[in-house]
């Protein structure tokens, strides 16, 4: 069983003129996020970079909440396992660059890595799960595929 996973997810923009809210693009600005399963309950969160002073350090952290949801949806045997999350955020928060979309995609991709070790990430399945959480596929699709039309 895999006990740690790392992912790298890009910033995005879905505010593209006449394509506003119907197409999006990935940008060369990245959040790097990792998770390690712990032998004890709880969550430990270490964040550096953008938002390091403002993001929650508990289960309400968007990556952790999404990761937990993904673990349940993907049938991970211990969805309530203790977690150590590390994040190096380069995507500014609340600036229209998709930091929430990146957090959601990060959480789900981490869940995939833990729940389905050795199985190639199904990007279409990831999009379905991420869009259900985010509510706007134009925000999460480019974080998964690079460009979404």
Question: Where do the PLM segments sit?
Answer:
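ATP-binding N-lobe of GHMP and related small-molecule kinases
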Residues: 1-95, 113, 119
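Gly/Ser-rich oxyanion-binding loop with an adjacent helix/lid
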Residues: 77-149
